[in-house]
Amino acid sequence: LAPLGREIGLVEVQIGAIISASSLTLFLVSPFWGRASDIWGRRKILLIGLFGYSAGTVMFAGVFQMALLGYLVPLTALILLILTRVANATVMAAVSPSANAYMADITTLEDRIKGMGAIGAAGNIGSILGPAIGGLLASISLLTPLYFSVLLTLAAAVLTLFALPVLPKATVIKKPPRLKYSDPRILPLVVAGVLLFMGFAIVQQTIAFRFQDELALSGIETAKVVGFSLMFSAAAALLVQLLVIPRLSVRPFVLLRISMPIMMIAFGIMALGHS
């Protein structure tokens, strides 16, 4: 997104606004989709999220295409990109809560950790392959990775439609309980999660600009370099989750206390490095 935004004349703050609007929408809308999956069923909400994301990404890429062809000035493109990204995030937010809830419904209490781990592993594999494939596709054009992601999402939607069983009616809750972010049972975790992912978001939004400016890269070169750097980052995370974490017999909060200082050191090295 960073090199693509620069190609149409947007500056860093404007590109960051697009990403922030999307993230804020996901944060606000996800609880609604979680409750909706309790009422209308996991599979329906999951399909809404997958097909909706596909349509929203096509519109998002279409705005970029019009701007690249010169039909939109940067300000108009910015407004349309924010609107389409927010609309896209609104339906995309349905995917994660419905998929996790579906896994919880079809697994026993003993197998639930394995089931959720399978979802996490699938996400990590996607995080490894996605940036690498996107970086390679960017050599065709900066919009090609967006259109390719639409094809992948449509394939997932079709697979969900024809291969994912509909859960029995007994699993559907008519009046799901509401859980507020201010609930003292989860408030500390919510605050910690917000701060943690805020740090991740800052790095993800600025790393492409850093690479492009420090290494004097073109837009396509930036997409390739960032794609492969994200691939190696995701691969390292997956290896730690598979090989290190299972061998550590420590509580989750102890892991947080260990990992947070390591992350701070890593971010500091990234900030000071120039090559």
Spans of model-derived segments:
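Helix-to-loop junctions at the C-terminal end of transmembrane segments
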Residues: 29-41, 239-253
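Juxtamembrane intracellular "pre-TM" segments in multi-pass secondary transporters
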Residues: 165-191
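Pair of pore-lining "gating" transmembrane helices in MFS-fold secondary transporters
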Residues: 1-7, 86, 185-203
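C-terminal ends and interior cores of transmembrane alpha-helices
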Residues: 51-74, 262-274
